[in-house]
Amino acid sequence: MTRRTISQAIEYFRNFGWIAKVTVIGCDEQISEATAARAALAALNCLHVLIGAGHSTKMQVGGPGLANDRRAGFTVKADGALSYMVSYGGQGNVGFDDNWMDLFSGADAQEIIANLGIALEQAVNPALHRPLSERLLDAMQWYGEAVREPSQGAKAVKYVTALERMVMTDEKDDIASLVSSRVAALCLEEPTVHCRDRWQVDVRRAYDIRSRLVHGSVSPTSEIVFEGVRLGSQLARSTLLNAVRLIGAKGLRDEAATNRDLARWFDGMVRHVDEVILQSIPRASTMPFA
């Protein structure tokens, strides 16, 4: 019976392309199992951010061990005619280019992956207290839940919540302005007013759609919600990837970092970006009056 059970377990795992091996430090069996499950999910959330929502919506931890996803449907039309369909699909995501792994070969990508590994140390060792790693993994969780979420309305809400968890530090007033300025400072590609303002406008738009959704002024099936999902996904992913790189290994390992420290860091970054933009603006030449 034991051999048969082991054989069935092995057959189950053969249905999956990736297997997580998690080592939990200093815990009993029950806590270790729960911690390992959370850590595997945290790693999946990181993969969602690395790969992007478009190629990772079907990724999950565990689930049914199905070799393929077979579905069928019948429809009777008004004239009595019968139409039908059968579809076959794999359990994982498809559509990657052959060289998709090359996206992660650059220096910035390698730094991000290494820093995500540092953040995940918090997930497998409950004794660690690293506030910035915890904050990052929380934000990644909101992003991952948004990717896997079937409801478009819930997706829009969760993507913006990922933004908030990453850049909010207990502030209570003018939240949309604060989030938009910090996201723009993190994600700015070039030091121009246009680029900064574009990021801020996009964040405010995603924030407005989220607010209208949660306060009931728009339907979760409204067309505007799809705009919220698109913006939220792009903004959250860019913010998280840049935060991982800029916080760095030292920040992710810091056990004494506080919300106040992070707020000062964000505010300093916003001021620095504004100063760089100001310095890059050509000054108008002036002539003395005759």
Question: Which residues make up each language-model segment?
Answer:
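Charged, non-catalytic interaction/linker regions at domain boundaries
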Residues: 1-154, 161, 227-229, 238-290
